[in-house]
């Protein structure tokens, strides 16, 4: 992974994506900035939403300074745009229907990191021809391919 070039005072634009073969199934996550900086990873059994949150978390952990996250995940973007997380915390991490919030472990870490960073969230339509969104989708899928098949 190369380090992104940062412009002081300007947010670093980071694209994130998660992918899953089956749901649950093997999954991958990725983040990338325009240029060469990116990171990706995979888990043997996970969900697409978990990988989307994981991608955003890894991006925020990896970039110093203000960050602009661009994601095709309504789940991730709306959590911050609509401040779902505030309701989750106030309700003891219970969501709709008084059910426990899924992926709480990742959400808690991501929320903590966004409190330490200046993060802006943007939604991009998936598979719409956005070059960077297509790039992180390909990186997330390539990460899945690195998993050893079960014998």
Residue ranges and their predicted role:
Residues 44-47, 98-103, 151:
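Short C-terminal domain-edge/linker segments immediately following a structured domain
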